[in-house]
From Swiss-Prot:
Gene3D superfamilies: 3.90.1150.30. The gene is yyaQ. It comes from Bacillus subtilis (strain 168). This is Uncharacterized protein YyaQ. Disulfide bonds: none annotated.
C-alpha cells in the first residue's frame, strides 16, 4: 500500500516539490504543484468512501492526477482507480491509495500528470 508520505517523498526527490495545504477548511488536503507556474499536477485528499460510491468506514486517502482520456477510460476499474473526485472526470482520475499496490505504476501516472500540467 502506498501512503501520502511515500508520495511526498517521491515528488520531493524527483521534482523538487513539496505539498502545500491551500484550504483551511480541509487541512489534510495536499496539493502538488509545479514550482514554476504553481499549476497542480496532483491533489491528495482524505474522503469518506461513500463520496466515491465505495463501501467502507472511515476516511481514505485518494490521489487525483491528470490523465489523457483514452488512458483514464482504460484505468478506471471502480475499485481503486475512479473518475476524478471534484475534478474534470474526463481528464482526471482518483486513485484510492490503500487499495493500490504497484507503486511503480502510480509513480508513472504521477510523472504523466506532471508533464501534462506544465
Amino acid at each position: 500500500m502506498l501512503t501520502r508520505e511515500d508520495i511526498f517523498k517521491h515528488v520531493k526527490e524527483k521534482y523538487g516539490t513539496s505539498p502545500d495545504y491551500p484550504w483551511e477548511k480541509y487541512p489534510n488536503y495536499a496539493s502538488l504543484r509545479h514550482t514554476s507556474n504553481k499549476k497542480w499536477y496532483g491533489l491528495i485528499m482524505n474522503v469518506l468512501p461513500e463520496k466515491l460510491g465505495l463501501d467502507g468506514h472511515g476516511e481514505i486517502d485518494i490521489l487525483n492526477l491528470k490523465c489523457p482520456p483514452e488512458i483514464s477510460d482504460r484505468l478506471r476499474n471502480g475499485e481503486n482507480i475512479l473518475p476524478g473526485y471534484h475534478m474534470d472526470k474526463e481528464h482526471w482520475i482518483s486513485i484510492v491509495l490503500e487499495r493500490t499496490d504497484p507503486e511503480g505504476e502510480i509513480y508513472n501516472l504521477i510523472e504523466q500528470s506532471f508533464h501534462l500540467t506544465k
